[in-house]
Amino acid sequence: GQNEFEEIDLIQKGGNYGWNIREGFHCLKKNPGCVENFLIDPIHEYSREEGQSITGGYVYRGKEIPKLVGSYLYGDFVTGKIWALKQKNGKKISNELVIQVPFQISTFGQDISGEVYFTDFGSGNIFRIAKKN
């Protein structure tokens, strides 16, 4: 994202995702007639109403939360939202809010068991995404 939308791309070697031409699925105002047939579409986007700064994450491969297995967990630095995105063959199946925390999510990590963690920029604390008791 740059000004209005954040996006998630499924990377292909040599792929053109439209940087400096479009944001998400939308042509930039300075290039309103952008040619889209040679660009690779994102699998998901969200507007500034949902968040303002995407923080890339990991595909969940842990055992603690079975319903998240295979989901791409990512967050938003400004809102503290963490979502689970499911895709099949490069197309979004679902995108669900997992949790909203009162932190600035600056990075994600994954341990050897596939459990996912995130870091709060303000405190530097590390948190594990876990099932609610």
Model-derived segments and spans:
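Conserved blade-ending motifs and adjacent loop-strand segments that build the rim/top face
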Residues: 54, 91-112
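Blade-level signature of beta-propeller repeat domains, shared across WD40, Kelch, NHL, RCC1
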Residues: 107-133
